[in-house]
Amino acid sequence: MRIKPDDNWRWYYDEEHDRMMLDLANGMLFRSRFARKMLTPDAFSPAGFCVDDAALYFSFEEKCRDFNLSKEQKAELVLNALVAIRYLKPQMPKSWHFVSHGEMWVPMPGDAACVWLSDTHEQVNLLVVESGENAALCLLAQPCVVIAGRAMQLGDAIKIMNDRLKPQVNVDSFSLEQAV
């Protein structure tokens, strides 16, 4: 099922589930990854889904097409990205878990990025939600990963210094002629 932004969509905080929610107005609800302690005060006043939200939705949806995720996972990632941009409290970078490359890439919101874990050198796929001069707020763009003994799931937020981030290259986009 494909979801499409609608001016009947509504943001609200659900006390029972301790999560930011989005009422999709067709009997469907989206429960974000973000609990009360992670949200700004704006999150606790119900709000409509505005034109800016819809524009960001379509931008993130387009950028997420290349991720190796199911349609449902991509939709979940996009909606969590909207919650993060609109309602997430500022975070401190947690870059010590990742390999530094010594060069600075300044990603743009919606960019597919990757980092490598310092301890295992495992690649981790990310969606850049907000970008600054030195660090970027990212969401995990894969089903799960364990970072320093803590399990992260699709859509979890982490801020990372730009010298750890690399643009993600979509292997499927290369042709045989380019490889030879």
UniProtKB/Swiss-Prot annotation:
A GO term for molecular function: identical protein binding
Subunit description: Interacts directly with FtsZ. Monomer in solution.
Family the UniProt entry places it in: Belongs to the ZapC family.
GO biological process: division septum assembly; FtsZ-dependent cytokinesis; regulation of cell division
Cellular-component GO terms for this entry: cell division site; cytoplasm
Predominant localisation class: cytoplasm
Domain of life, per lineage: Bacteria
Keywords: Cell cycle, Cell division, Cytoplasm, Septation
Job of this protein: Contributes to the efficiency of the cell division process by stabilizing the polymeric form of the cell division protein FtsZ. Acts by promoting interactions between FtsZ protofilaments and suppressing the GTPase activity of FtsZ.
Localization annotation: Cytoplasm
Pfam families assigned: ZapC_C, ZapC_N
Phenotypic consequence of gene deletion: Mutants divide almost normally under standard growth conditions.
Species, as recorded: Escherichia coli (strain K12)
Protein name: Cell division protein ZapC
